Design a protein with these regions (language model features):
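Active-site beta-loop-alpha junctions enriched in small/polar residues
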Residues: 9-13, 39-41, 65-68, 93-96
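Conserved, mostly hydrophobic/aromatic
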Residues: 8, 28, 36, 53, ...
Length: 120
């Protein structure tokens, strides 16, 4: 039977990662998960996280980034995720001020498309 990798979304473990980020990742690996989707980085750099994932046999399944971070520091975000080895950046939430109707959705869609083009 083919094995499909399963990752845990670290937002669901935000209390645990706030208390002990590396320890939480160790426990995730011990439980048998194949990877994690980041929702914050616990103050660790991309290289540190990549090393920890490699040590634990985990893969990066994606990561959350606020749209404001993409607007303000896209080049830094790109560099961070390249170093981490992450291929999938997710904007997890948009405030109502961002979309507020059909024109707002079109604007957000265009902006996200531009970010996606740069992140590739």
């Amino acid at each position: 039977m083919k094995h499909f990798p399963i990752a845990v979304q670290l937002y669901t473990l935000r209390d645990q990662t706030a208390a002990d980020y590396p320890g939480t990742l160790r426990e995730v690996a011990r439980m048998g998960y194949d990877g994690v989707e980041f929702a914050g980085y616990g103050g660790f750099g991309a290289g540190e996280l990549k090393s920890l994932l490699q040590e634990l046999g985990l893969r990066c399944a994606g990561a959350h980034e606020a749209i404001e971070r993409l607007e303000q520091a896209l080049d830094e975000v790109i560099a961070f995720h390249r170093e981490l080895g992450n291929r999938y950046v997710v904007v997890p939430w948009l405030g109502e001020d961002r979309w507020g109707g059909p024109d707002g959705w079109r604007k957000v869609g265009k902006q996200l498309g531009e970010f996606g083009g740069r992140l590739r």
